[in-house]
C-alpha cells in the first residue's frame, strides 16, 4: 500500500512537472479581467517564464502565466514585470494590429495536433490592450503570414506603473485552437513568450527554443485541461 501511495504521489507530481501547465476548469465564462487578485484568477497556480529563448537569464522579467477553461473558452493571464516599456503610438483596442511584435507583447503559441506540430495558432496582447492573432503553418505559410485569420478572441490589459508590472489577459474560443470536444485530460502543445523594452529588447520564453526564433514547435511544452 505504501508503495502504491508513493507511486501515486510521484505520478501526480509528474503530471504537473517541468514543461507542463495545468489549465483549471471554472464553472462558467466570466467578464475578462487583467487583475490577478479578482474573482477566478485569485489563487490559480501558474507557471513562470524567466529566461530567454536560448535559456539565458533575463533578470527583472520573471513572468507568471495562469490559465483556466470552460467548454467554450480558454483563458490566460500574464503577470509581466518590466524595466522599461516600448509602446506603439496611437494604439487601437478595436482593430487588429499587425506586426504588434515590433512592440511590447505577451504571446501564446498553441496547437492540438501532435502529428502536425507545424500547424498552430498565435495570440498576442500588448500592455495597451492591442491584439493580433495568426494562423501559423511553418511548412506552407499562409497568405500574409496568416494574420488575417480571426479567432474571435478578446484581450484586456493594464499597466501598474508604480510597481512596473503590466498585466495581459486573453479569452480564446476553444474551437479556434482545438476541434475536439473539450474535456478534462485533453492536451495542447503550447509555449509562452514575451518581447519587452528597447535598447536592448528583452526576450522571454517559457520553454527554450534554443534559437533566435520563437517559431520552434518542437520546443513547445504541454497544457493539460484539469479540474
PLM region descriptions:
Residues 1-7:
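Sec-dependent signal peptide recognition
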Residues 7-15:
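Hydrophobic h-region of N-terminal signal peptides that target proteins for export
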Residues 15-227:
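Structural preference for beta-rich elements and adjacent junctions enriched in aromatics
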Amino acid at each position: 500500500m505504501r508503495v502504491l501511495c508513493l507511486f501515486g504521489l510521484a505520478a501526480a507530481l509528474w503530471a504537473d512537472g517541468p514543461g507542463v501547465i495545468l489549465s483549471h476548469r471554472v464553472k462558467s465564462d466570466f467578464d475578462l479581467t487583467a487583475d490577478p487578485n479578482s474573482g477566478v484568477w485569485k489563487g490559480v497556480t501558474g507557471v513562470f517564464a524567466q529566461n530567454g529563448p536560448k535559456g539565458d537569464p533575463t533578470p527583472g522579467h520573471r513572468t507568471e502565466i495562469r490559465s483556466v477553461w470552460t467548454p467554450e473558452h480558454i483563458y490566460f493571464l500574464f503577470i509581466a514585470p518590466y524595466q522599461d516599456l516600448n509602446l506603439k503610438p496611437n494604439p487601437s483596442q478595436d482593430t487588429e494590429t499587425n506586426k504588434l511584435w515590433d512592440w511590447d507583447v505577451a504571446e501564446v503559441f498553441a496547437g492540438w495536433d501532435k502529428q502536425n506540430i507545424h500547424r498552430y495558432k498565435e495570440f498576442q496582447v500588448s500592455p495597451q490592450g492591442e491584439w493580433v492573432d495568426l494562423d501559423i503553418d511553418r511548412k506552407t505559410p499562409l497568405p500574409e503570414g496568416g494574420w488575417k485569420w480571426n479567432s474571435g478572441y478578446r484581450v484586456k490589459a493594464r499597466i501598474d506603473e508604480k510597481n512596473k508590472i503590466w498585466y495581459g489577459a486573453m479569452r480564446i474560443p476553444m474551437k479556434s485552437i482545438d476541434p475536439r470536444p473539450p474535456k478534462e485530460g485533453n492536451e495542447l502543445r503550447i509555449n509562452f513568450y514575451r518581447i519587452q523594452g528597447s535598447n536592448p529588447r528583452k526576450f522571454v520564453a517559457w520553454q527554450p527554443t534554443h534559437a533566435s526564433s520563437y517559431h520552434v514547435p518542437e520546443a513547445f511544452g504541454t497544457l493539460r485541461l484539469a479540474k
